[in-house]
């Protein structure tokens, strides 16, 4: 249980830090862009972690960290906000590239370590 608590807290702090840095240093950056990068990189890291066995506690710590780092709920909120603002094409593109990008990110991470 402690691994889950620590991992989730670390992941949430990392997500906050990446989002803040993205907004501060990115050219015309939007939070949506930071969420996209966070989710794709988180999937790639998860693929890397799961490609080969790790000690149980370490694996649980990393999976919990990535659960706190990635943010499916914010992704959904942003996609629905685009849809609500009648930016339907942008919403669909965001949905597709996020889902496909996350799948390919996971495969990339898996293949790097496998």
Curated annotation (Swiss-Prot):
Activity regulation description: Na(+) is not transported, but it plays an essential structural role and its presence is essential for fluoride channel function.
GO MF annotation: an example: metal ion binding
Topology within the bilayer: Multi-pass membrane protein
Subcellular location per the Swiss-Prot or TrEMBL entry: Cell membrane
Keywords of this entry: Cell membrane, Ion channel, Ion transport, Membrane, Metal-binding, Sodium, Transmembrane, Transmembrane helix, Transport
Catalyses which reaction(s): fluoride(in) = fluoride(out)
Binding site for Na(+): 67, 70
Primary subcellular site in the record, as a coarse category: membrane
Pfam families: CRCB
Example of a GO biological process term: cellular detoxification of fluoride
Keyword Cell membrane attached: yes
GO cellular component annotations of the record: plasma membrane
Transmembrane segments: 3-23, 31-51, 57-77, 92-112
Function as written in the Swiss-Prot or TrEMBL entry: Fluoride-specific ion channel. Important for reducing fluoride concentration in the cell, thus reducing its toxicity.
Family to which the UniProt record says this protein belongs: Belongs to the fluoride channel Fluc/FEX (TC 1.A.43) family.
Name of protein: Fluoride-specific ion channel FluC 2
């Amino acid at each position: 249980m402690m691994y889950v608590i620590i991992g989730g807290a670390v992941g949430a702090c990392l997500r906050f830090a990446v989002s803040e840095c993205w907004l501060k240093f990115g050219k015309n950056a939007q939070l949506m862009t930071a969420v996209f990068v966070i989710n794709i990189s988180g999937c790639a890291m998860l693929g890397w972690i799961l490609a080969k066995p790790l000690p149980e506690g370490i694996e649980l710590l990393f999976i919990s960290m990535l659960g706190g780092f990635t943010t499916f709920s914010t992704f959904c909120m942003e996609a629905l906000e685009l849809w609500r603002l009648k930016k339907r094409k942008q919403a669909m593109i965001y949905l597709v590239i996020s889902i496909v990008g996350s799948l390919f990110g996971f495969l990339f991470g898996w293949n790097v370590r496998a």
